[in-house]
Each structure stands twice: as C-alpha cells, then as structure tokens.
C-alpha cells in the first residue's frame, strides 16, 4: 500500500568493541531469531582468529574483504514485448554492502570448518585476498552483467 511520505532510515548503532557501524550491520545480517549476543560472539571470535592467523588488524581485513566482495553491476529482469531480458544495472551503494555481507555469510555457512567463527574468519581472509566463495559469487554476477551488456539500452 502506498505511503504518504518516505519512511526515514533507521540509525544503526556502532558495535560496542570496535565502534564500527559496518561491523554492527554485519552482526545484524548474521543474527538469527534476534540472538544478537550469539552473532556478536561469532563475529568477535572470527576477528580473534583473524588476528592470530594473519597478525593484522581484523577491522582492516574486514573492510578490505567487504570492499572486494561488493558488486558494481548486477542484472535485473525486464519484460519487453513478450520476452524477458536480463538487463545490467549499476548497484547503489547501500545495496552493494548489503549484498556483500549476505554473500560472505552464505559462503561462510557452506565452508567445512568446525565453528562458524572459524568459517567466517577464513572466508574474510580469503575475500581480502580476492578469492573464496563470496568472491566467486561476485565474479558470477559480474560475468552475467557482462554477457548481457547488449541489453543495457533497456534501462529501468
């Protein structure tokens, strides 16, 4: 149902340990059934693993990984004259980070390590190096957009 005015964006409070809004958003993406403390434990555990394994600042690795995974373009279906075309469109910044976070979460879930913290740590380390499941997903989306470049004149 249409609304009379635009609903204001909710302000997300920065996470308690690092004071970073991106980390807080990632915790919210990771959270299941409203269990924020569990999500916090997983993320901070992953950051501890990263610190031990890479001897680097975990926030640095996290932001590099997220920057690498963020997609620039994606495809959207557009119906023109009875045919559906996959039209490449640029991704707006808020959606870029949301997709990146979702892809990292899903890639970490599919990994084989014992705890979710370890899976997440290894996925973030790989994404920071430009490999891993989340990067594979990004490349796949970019490939789809590149393949359908011919339909880019069907802009939305």
UniProtKB/Swiss-Prot annotation:
<dbReference type="InterPro" id="IPR036823">
    <property type="entry name" value="Ribosomal_uS7_dom_sf"/>
</dbReference>
<dbReference type="InterPro" id="IPR023798">
    <property type="entry name" value="Ribosomal_uS7_dom"/>
</dbReference>
<dbReference type="InterPro" id="IPR000235">
    <property type="entry name" value="Ribosomal_uS7"/>
</dbReference>
<keyword id="KW-0687">Ribonucleoprotein</keyword>
<comment type="similarity">
    <text>Belongs to the universal ribosomal protein uS7 family.</text>
</comment>
<dbReference type="Pfam" id="PF00177">
    <property type="entry name" value="Ribosomal_S7"/>
</dbReference>
<dbReference type="GO" id="GO:0015935">
    <property type="term" value="C:small ribosomal subunit"/>
</dbReference>
<comment type="subunit">
    <text>Part of the 30S ribosomal subunit. Contacts proteins S9 and S11.</text>
</comment>
<dbReference type="InterPro" id="IPR020606">
    <property type="entry name" value="Ribosomal_uS7_CS"/>
</dbReference>
<keyword id="KW-0694">RNA-binding</keyword>
<dbReference type="GO" id="GO:0000049">
    <property type="term" value="F:tRNA binding"/>
</dbReference>
<keyword id="KW-0689">Ribosomal protein</keyword>
<keyword id="KW-0699">rRNA-binding</keyword>
<dbReference type="GO" id="GO:0003735">
    <property type="term" value="F:structural constituent of ribosome"/>
</dbReference>
<keyword id="KW-0820">tRNA-binding</keyword>
<dbReference type="GO" id="GO:0006412">
    <property type="term" value="P:translation"/>
</dbReference>
<dbReference type="InterPro" id="IPR005717">
    <property type="entry name" value="Ribosomal_uS7_bac/org-type"/>
</dbReference>
<dbReference type="GO" id="GO:0019843">
    <property type="term" value="F:rRNA binding"/>
</dbReference>
<protein>
    <recommendedName>
        <fullName>Small ribosomal subunit protein uS7</fullName>
    </recommendedName>
</protein>
<comment type="function">
    <text>One of the primary rRNA binding proteins, it binds directly to 16S rRNA where it nucleates assembly of the head domain of the 30S subunit. Is located at the subunit interface close to the decoding center, probably blocks exit of the E-site tRNA.</text>
</comment>
């Amino acid at each position: 149902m249409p609304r009379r005015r635009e609903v204001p964006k909710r302000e997300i409070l920065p996470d308690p340990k690092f004071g970073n809004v991106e980390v807080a958003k990632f915790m919210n993406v990771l959270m299941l059934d409203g269990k924020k403390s569990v999500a916090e434990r997983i993320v901070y555990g992953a950051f501890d693993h990263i610190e031990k394994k890479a001897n680097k600042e975990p926030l640095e690795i996290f932001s590099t990984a997220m920057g690498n995974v963020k997609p620039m373009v994606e495809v959207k279906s557009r119906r023109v004259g009875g045919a559906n075309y996959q039209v490449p469109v640029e991704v707006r910044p808020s959606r870029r980070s949301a997709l990146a976070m979702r892809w990292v979460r899903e890639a970490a879930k599919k990994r084989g390590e014992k705890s979710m913290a370890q899976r997440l740590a290894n996925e973030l380390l790989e994404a920071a190096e430009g490999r891993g499941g989340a990067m594979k997903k990004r490349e796949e989306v970019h490939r789809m957009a590149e393949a359908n470049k011919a339909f880019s004149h069907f802009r939305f």
